[in-house]
Swiss-Prot record:
Keywords: Ribonucleoprotein, Ribosomal protein, RNA-binding, rRNA-binding, tRNA-binding
Location of the region described as Disordered in the Swiss-Prot/TrEMBL record: 1-22
Role this protein plays: Binds 23S rRNA and is also seen to make contacts with the A and possibly P site tRNAs.
Natural source organism: Nitratiruptor sp. (strain SB155-2)
Protein name, UniProt field: Large ribosomal subunit protein uL16
Subunit structure: Part of the 50S ribosomal subunit.
């Protein structure tokens, strides 16, 4: 699973996920990719599940880039625990996603196969996404 090797603080505040993505909103490495259309958060298991689905579809040909990294700890208190007694322990690592953010990129695969693989990955993600190419990238989301 993806997670930081070391952090300055073990736990973080929740924060707010507002606005649109100004960084990481265009294809940088591949020729086709997945772009988020709405706010959400993605955890390391979802990132890995989508990556495995894509890799199996393209039979390990081409190259896949993961453009997101879960660096925010999500905490949870144990079940049937009374309130108080401090913040819960870290349960998983997530990343807040804003509309316009590129999640995955792919190159070295023919476009029809790449679209099928990216569609499989889109089903694994918890927010609306669309497939973008270098030509269609300039469209408004």
């Amino acid at each position: 699973m993806l997670m930081p090797k070391k952090t300055k603080y073990r736990k973080q505040q929740k924060g707010r996920n507002r606005g649109k993505a100004y960084n990481g909103n265009s294809l940088a490495f591949g020729t086709i990719g997945i772009k988020a259309l709405e706010h959400g958060r993605i955890d390391s298991r979802q990132i890995e599940a989508a990556r495995v689905a894509m890799t199996r579809k393209v039979k390990r040909t081409g190259k896949i880039w993961i453009r997101v990294f879960p660096d925010k700890p999500l905490t949870k208190k144990p079940l049937e625990t009374r309130m108080g007694k401090g913040k819960g322990s870290v349960e998983k690592w997530v990343m807040n996603i804003k509309p316009g953010r590129i999640i995955y990129e792919m190159a070295g695969v023919e476009e029809s196969l790449a679209r099928e693989a990216l569609d499989l990955a889109r089903y694994k993600l918890p927010f609306k996404t669309k497939i973008v190419t270098q030509e269609s990238e300039n469209e408004i989301y």
